[in-house]
Amino acid sequence: MAAAGAASNPGGGPEMVRGQAFDVGPRYINLAYIGEGAYGMVCSAHDNVNKVRVAIKKISPFEHQTYCQRTLREIKILLRFKHENIIGINDIIRAPTIEQMKDVYIVQDLMETDLYKLLKTQHLSNDHICYFLYQILRGLKYIHSANVLHRDLKPSNLLLNTTCDLKICDFGLARVADPDHDHTGFLTEYVATRWYRAPEIMLNSKGYTKSIDIWSVGCILAEMLSNRPIFPGKHYLDQLNHILGILGSPSQEDLNCIINLKARNYLLSLPHKNKVPWNRLFPNADPKALDLLDKMLTFNPHKRIEVEAALAHPYLEQYYDPSDEPVAEAPFKFEMELDDLPKETLKELIFEETARFQPGY
């Protein structure tokens, strides 16, 4: 009987893990179950070539346009990015023909845990909070320098290993920044995880500007300080109410930035709220951490701190080194917007994008 979570491979075909075939041999062997993603299973495996254990994500996206889109975005972006604080793609395994391709296996560095799991079990020291925040912002500086927005930064998308290295993952919702087309109506549905969503997403923004990611990093910093999410909204408007309950009512100047009248009138209809002092919410926190938190969790996206200024903030001074905070070689361009392409076309693009890993390529 195979151990729980271990793989069985009696006949030399694909290894089976919890009833799922993992067709990744002969290079990758000794599979062990790690967890389940939105559209696939993740296992660790031994890499026979590099003699290390790696993570392998099995993705089966081809039945759904949205899953194809996210898979293609993730692959396109991660193959072009190269940075210590962003998870890379080491290898991609798929069938040799498009007709046979039902799954895609993405091989990445094995990271022991993520910030979500860590915060469920550990109180972080100020030193750990400072070092994790520095690495998040160092990775984000590179992402933003490529003119890309992550748009789904949250603790479970920050991978960690035992030496406290941090890598940002999951670029399935990423976009090229497009401030000129950021405006939308009041309460348009938005996909990223609600608790880490900036207030303008609820009001009048598509989340196409870099300030959207900075807000999420502020939410993550607050969560590291207290081991609980700062704005755990139960639904769309509740999310906004949580934010205003701590930040207080927006100023007239901040209201003037909200072009959408429905959104502005909604805010004006709410009773006045005072800002809650950060040191009352986080009495044990380093005052410098709270100063940076305040600059990230700023209601008005135009006044929110940018990533370079955040890195240069006194709280991160022991790590700050602009000469060791690399930027992307060139801004990222999606030749085409993927949103409207049919899944058959997206499958062809995924097939092409992964060809470089095929034997004899």
Curated annotation (Swiss-Prot):
Chain positions with Phosphotyrosine modification: Y190
Keyword list, A-Z: Apoptosis, ATP-binding, Cell cycle, Cytoplasm, Cytoskeleton, Kinase, Nucleotide-binding, Phosphoprotein, Serine/threonine-protein kinase, Transferase
Locations listed in the record: Cytoplasm, Cytoskeleton, Microtubule organizing center, Centrosome; Cytoplasm; Cytoplasm, Cytoskeleton, Spindle
One Gene Ontology MF term: protein serine kinase activity
Residues of the active site: D152 (proton acceptor)
UniProt-reported outcome of changing T188 to V/D: No effect on Tyr phosphorylation
Catalytic activity: L-seryl-[protein] + ATP = O-phospho-L-seryl-[protein] + ADP + H(+); L-threonyl-[protein] + ATP = O-phospho-L-threonyl-[protein] + ADP + H(+)
PANTHER family named in the record: MITOGEN-ACTIVATED PROTEIN KINASE
Family indicated by similarity: Belongs to the protein kinase superfamily. CMGC Ser/Thr protein kinase family. MAP kinase subfamily.
Protein name in the entry: Mitogen-activated protein kinase 1
